[in-house]
């Protein structure tokens, strides 16, 4: 089997090289043999490690689990090194994998998370070249000052602080010069290698990753699209006074250069920053939940990269209010109406612990017989908690350990699910995990108020949809009254929770208890 793996890897290398050179798909100057060879060699070594390390060990034994964890860790480290060496698209895909907590083995997610802080930086000369090519001017002609050290560097671009000739302070997002040319070739190479691995491990189902990259990378590499997304979401969520989205300066923006209003603050997972600046951690967590519930359930237009570097918080010194600043609008998921309704109804069923409807809507979303696993993936809760009601108790440390260990145990079933569910679901799962990571860092995870906000948005979305499909005035009035009653019940329950947690509520409960005992 190991010999077959090496033969297939060699065959893939030869076939890829012949095809790429023969079809002039690859320019050796920017995508040389070293780059391709590095990816092929890493894939071959990882494959060989899995084949040989677990070959003669009884499946399910303690030794098997220990060795498998070690192979996961070695493989994740090799994959991280490959991403750092090949940069660009490889880092982007590695970051995506690192965000899939509770879906991939912890050895992978923990190891690949560091890619968010290990993105490459373009040189001053490369930055000047991109600005010259896209804007037709030198940096000194456009800016009074331009900071050489970037505010942040990501897999596809980096951001610099600058001051325009008219005195406006701006953030300048500049694409790494070679990313555009290399991205399609990188994706093609990944596709070839994953197909080879699937021949060796038939249960290996990660083609969804390549398909998502094919669809999303061209959008992320078009900064004009990012600017349009920023303006759309700012208009869509204008009723949330706590949200700030940087203004776009279109006159100096292109597909590779984006100029926007400069905004600064602490990262949303930096609890120490919030405590130092008098920002209520629970309020930030609640407001972030409101934003994403509105985007997902009501509007179906979802910012899909809420890692901490893209979500900042700041307290206004004049008003004392805390703001959430939403950055990096390159990756959005547009949800179809039918998908959004099924997703709303599924979450309502999960919150109510209505298992028949959980099964029904999970199946409609492609989960099939794996609907219990799907429910656990969505909620990051155990099946026992899902059955009991996910709003009934917070996540315990033991439950969290159980979920993470199950991610490794059920990896074949998880990858099967990820291949079967609609493509829209994949980015939502990533978004859910990133948001859970923020809640975990702030110690505000899965509070009752977050489920109440989700319920409100789901009820509003379903009611709006039902009214739009009804031609009967009586039916529309009935839908509106049912909606109002449901929202009133949620408000009443929220008031009960507030009283229960307040001093007044504690006093009332103690008073009633004394009255009861006295009688």
Curated annotation (Swiss-Prot):
Active site, UniProt feature: 305 (proton acceptor)
Chief place of localization: mitochondrion
Localization of this protein: Mitochondrion
Any one Gene Ontology BP term: lipid homeostasis
CDD domains in UniProt: ADCK1-like (cd13969)
Binding site for ATP: 151-159, 173
EC number from the UniProt entry: 2.7.-.-
InterPro entries linked: ABC1_dom, ADCK1_dom, Kinase-like_dom_sf, Mito_struct-func_regulator, Prot_kinase_dom
Keyword vocabulary terms for this entry: ATP-binding, Kinase, Mitochondrion, Nucleotide-binding, Serine/threonine-protein kinase, Transferase, Transit peptide
Record-level Gene Ontology MF annotations: ATP binding; protein serine/threonine kinase activity
Domain Protein kinase span(s) in chain numbering: 145-481
Superkingdom in the source lineage: Eukaryota
Any single Pfam family the record assigns to this protein: ABC1
GO cellular component: mitochondrial inner membrane
Function: Appears to be essential for maintaining mitochondrial cristae formation and mitochondrial function by acting via YME1L1 in a kinase-independent manner to regulate essential mitochondrial structural proteins OPA1 and IMMT. The action of this enzyme is not yet clear. It is not known if it has protein kinase activity and what type of substrate it would phosphorylate (Ser, Thr or Tyr).
Family: Belongs to the protein kinase superfamily. ADCK protein kinase family.
Designated name of the protein: AarF domain-containing protein kinase 1
Organism, scientific name: Gallus gallus (Chicken)
Lineage of source species: Eukaryota, Metazoa, Chordata, Craniata, Vertebrata
């Amino acid at each position: 089997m190991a010999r077959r793996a090496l033969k297939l890897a060699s065959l893939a290398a030869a076939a890829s090289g012949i095809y790429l050179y023969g079809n002039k798909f690859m320019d050796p100057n920017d995508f040389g043999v070293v780059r391709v060879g590095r990816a092929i060699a890493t894939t071959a070594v990882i494959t060989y490690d899995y084949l040989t390390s677990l070959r003669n060990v009884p499946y399910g034994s303690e030794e098997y689990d220990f060795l498998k964890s070690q192979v996961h860790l070695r493989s994740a480290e090799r994959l991280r090194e490959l991403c750092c060496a090949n940069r660009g698209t490889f880092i982007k895909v590695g970051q995506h994998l690192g965000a899939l907590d509770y879906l991939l083995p912890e050895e992978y997610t923990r190891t690949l998370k560091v890619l968010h802080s290990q993105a490459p930086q373009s040189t001053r000369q490369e930055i000047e070249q991109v600005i010259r090519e896209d804007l037709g001017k030198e940096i000194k002609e456009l800016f009074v000052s331009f900071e050489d050290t970037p505010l942040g560097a990501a897999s596809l671009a980096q951001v610099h602080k600058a001051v325009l000739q008219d005195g406006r302070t701006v953030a300048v997002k500049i694409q790494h010069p070679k990313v555009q040319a290399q991205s399609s070739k990188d994706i093609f190479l990944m596709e070839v290698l994953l197909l080879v691995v699937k021949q060796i491990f038939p249960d290996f189902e990660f083609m969804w990753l390549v398909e998502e990259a094919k669809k999303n990378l061209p959008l992320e590499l078009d900064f004009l699209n990012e600017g349009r997304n920023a303006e759309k979401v700012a208009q869509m969520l204008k009723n949330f006074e706590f949200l700030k989205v940087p203004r776009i300066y279109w006159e100096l923006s292109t597909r590779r250069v984006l100029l926007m209003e400069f905004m600064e603050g602490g990262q949303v997972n930096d609890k120490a920053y919030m405590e130092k600046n008098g920002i209520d951690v629970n309020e930030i967590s609640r407001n972030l939940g409101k934003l994403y519930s509105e985007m997902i359930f009501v509007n179906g237009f979802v910012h899909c990269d809420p890692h901490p570097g893209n979500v900042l918080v700041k307290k206004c010194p004049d008003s004392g209010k805390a703001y959430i600043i939403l950055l990096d609008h390159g990756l959005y998921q547009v949800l179809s109406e039918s998908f959004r309704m099924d997703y709303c109804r599924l979450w309502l069923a999960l919150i109510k612990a209505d298992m028949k409807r959980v099964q029904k809507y999970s199946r409609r979303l492609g989960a099939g017989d794996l609907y219990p696993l799907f429910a656990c993936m969505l909620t990051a809760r155990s099946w026992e908690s899902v059955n009991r009601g996910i709003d009934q108790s917070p996540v315990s440390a033991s439950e969290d350990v159980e979920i993470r260990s199950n991610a490794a145990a059920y990896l074949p079933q998880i990858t099967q699910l990820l291949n079967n569910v609609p493509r829209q679901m994949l980015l939502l799962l990533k978004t859910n995990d990133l948001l859970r990571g923020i809640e975990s860092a702030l110690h505000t995870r899965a509070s009752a108020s977050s489920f109440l906000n989700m319920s409100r948005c789901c009820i509003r979305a379903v009611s709006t949809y039902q009214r739009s499909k009804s031609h009967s005035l009586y039916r529309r009035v009935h839908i509106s009254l049912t909606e109002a009653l449901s929202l009133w019940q949620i408000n009443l329950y929220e008031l009960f929770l507030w009283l229960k947690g307040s001093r007044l509520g504690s006093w009332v409960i103690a008073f009633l208890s004394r009255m009861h005992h006295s009688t």
